Amino acid sequence: MGRLAATHEELTDVPGLLCLQGGREFTPGCVEMDRTVLALASTAVAAVVAGAARIGSDYDGAVLRARRHYEQLGATVVAVPDPRVDLDGALAALDDEVGLIVLPGGSPGGLLDVLIGAATAAVGERLLELHRAGVAISGASAGAMVMCARLIRPDRGGDTVAGLALADGLALPHWSPGTSRWRTPDDLMLWGLPECGGVILDADHISAVGRGEPSVRRDGVWSPVPRHTE
């Protein structure tokens, strides 16, 4: 069930919070945003699934950057093995102690393949199971794109396909007012996500967090998302 973009709109059937981030993850500019999300998670155990990265050193590097970043914030970090290499290990790492799942950026098409592709779909199913049980998910760039109902795959010719539909609409990472990297349908709801900024969607409301001016487009009109307050 997706989440509608409305100011402090009451939401139902949404167990774990989501954070849609615009990119430049694990950099100093993202510290306060990620600290906020971690504090809202059910536990300080963060599991990193870098499925948007290429197999091998790219995946390992993304996990290492996430580990360093979140350990500085006080989290216990679980480095989830690449499901394309060790599916059983990845599933075992996503246990019930996890309070936050982190999806770094990279290839949105590649991440979607990892989460719903026949060979590794069990990881996506486990992610959704944990989310329904109250586990938060924070996705940056490709990670945010995949969580939405629709996503653009710039690495697959720029086509628009179905995402996980944990949030309504389509995410535009690396966004700033007045810019557009991709063509999008006029009637589609859009999330404008600046680098080191984003939106938190929880059981009660939708709020902006981090840098820039995270915004939402509904009925063709852009409006800023109200700021998160403690």
Residue ranges and their predicted role:
Residues 2-43, 48-64, 68-71, 151-230:
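C-terminal and late-domain segments of enzyme folds
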Residues 42-46, 97-98, 134:
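A general structural motif
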Residues 53-116:
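Portal/gating segments that form or line small-molecule/metal binding sites
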Residues 103-179:
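Class I SAM-dependent methyltransferase SAM-binding "motif I" and its flanking Rossmann-like core
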Residues 19, 79-80, 102-103, 137-140, ...:
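General beta-strand structural signal in soluble alpha/beta enzymes
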Residues 30, 83-84, 119-120:
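A conditional alpha-helix N-cap/helix-loop micro-motif detector
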Residues 32, 36, 89-90, 126:
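A short acidic, amphipathic alpha-helical/loop segment
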